[in-house]
């Protein structure tokens, strides 16, 4: 766990470097729970004019505890563009440290004090229909961001067919690289290739769009952009549907998937041929590629004595459950694609 005294000193040094005319004083730092793969810290600073501001620090964990290997510089570049363009409702990205001050690459963001959508939707008084509409609208907004804004911060992957084939190939390649045989990966790769749906235009994809990464404050605010990339919009739809089915909170997609997708199509102009329950089901498998294979790589590293941590062990359960779920999805979609 990060030492809060050294974090406070490092944050103070970082702010002093950026705010030379009047740097704030760091009043407090405390660990934030809920961060799944990053080290999260809540800080409060006081500015010379008397104003207090809450900040959130999002840092890399020690190398041996990394569950998902993602790039803080790449994430910062995406967040910086989105913040400067006010393109998506989200906590603003304010500062970046390459590790010189805080000991690890760290993004400093404004703090949104709203609850997660996952927590808010369990309230007995929650308007779940309204939440579902807001989710569809938020996702449509992300997918409508002009890719030209990124100008090198995100690299377009090329044509749709090559991109999707590349994602499909990752399943078989991961099986070959794994220390033991995982035949389900070969099966998924072959099934996905044989059942590809119609292509769509490439868009900004959040990459981990789920209820716990949406904060309820003046609508919905999207957080945790470490998997952001240019890809097929149905990746986010598929991941949201898959994740929503695996948590105890109300499933905002499954309560009325036709209405959810109709609202999304109305906001984006997508066709019913391209965006429907079958294609979302297909992409619920595709969307899991990066997360699942990262867990698999971490599991292999742990078995080889190269990694450790409670989260790595915990995530092994996700591998077994994922295999069962994806095979079930493939079976249910036979004849629909």
Placement of each model-derived feature along the sequence:
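Phosphate/pyrophosphate-binding loops and the adjoining catalytic core of nucleotide-dependent enzymes
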Residues: 2-5, 30-31, 78-79, 337
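ATP-binding pocket architecture of kinase catalytic cores
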Residues: 30-166, 173-183, 199
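Conserved N-terminal boundary motif of the eukaryotic protein kinase catalytic domain
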Residues: 24-30
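Active-site activation/catalytic loop segments of kinase-like enzymes and analogous catalytic loops
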Residues: 235-271, 286-305
């Amino acid at each position: 766990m990060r030492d809060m005294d050294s974090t406070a000193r490092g944050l103070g040094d970082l702010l002093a470097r950026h705010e030379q005319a009047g740097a704030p004083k760091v009043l407090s730092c405390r660990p934030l729970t809920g961060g799944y793969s990053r080290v999260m810290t809540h800080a409060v600073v006081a500015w010379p004019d008397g104003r207090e501001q809450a900040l959130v620090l999002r840092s890399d964990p020690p190398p041996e505890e990394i569950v998902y290997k993602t790039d803080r510089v790449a994430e910062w570049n995406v967040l910086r563009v989105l913040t400067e363009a006010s393109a998506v409702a989200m906590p603003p990205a304010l500062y970046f440290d390459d590790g010189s001050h805080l000991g690890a690459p760290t993004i400093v963001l404004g703090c949104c004090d709203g609850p997660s959508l996952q927590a808010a939707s369990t309230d007995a008084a929650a308007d779940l229909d309204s939440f579902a509409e807001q989710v569809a609208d938020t996702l449509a907004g992300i997918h409508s961001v002009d890719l030209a804004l990124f100008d090198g911060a995100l690299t377009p992957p090329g044509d749709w067919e090559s991109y999707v084939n590349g994602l499909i190939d990752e399943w078989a390649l991961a099986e070959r690289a794994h220390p033991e045989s995982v035949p389900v990966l070969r099966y998924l790769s072959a099934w996905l290739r044989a059942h590809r749906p119609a292509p769509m235009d490439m868009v900004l994809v959040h990459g981990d769009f789920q209820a716990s990464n949406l904060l309820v404050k003046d609508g919905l605010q999207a957080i945790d952009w470490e998997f952001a990339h240019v890809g097929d919009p149905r990746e986010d739809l598929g991941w949201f549907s898959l994740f929503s089915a695996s948590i105890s909170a109300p499933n905002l997609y499954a309560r009325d998937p036709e209405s959810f997708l109709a609202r999304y199509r109305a906001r984006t102009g997508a066709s019913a041929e391209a965006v429907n329950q079958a294609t979302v089901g297909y992409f619920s498998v595709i969307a899991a590629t990066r997360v699942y294979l990262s867990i698999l790589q971490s599991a292999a590293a742990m078995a080889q004595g190269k990694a450790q941590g409670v989260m790595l062990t915990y995530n092994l359960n996700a591998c077994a459950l994922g295999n069962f779920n994806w095979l079930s999805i493939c079976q249910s979609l036979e004849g629909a694609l």
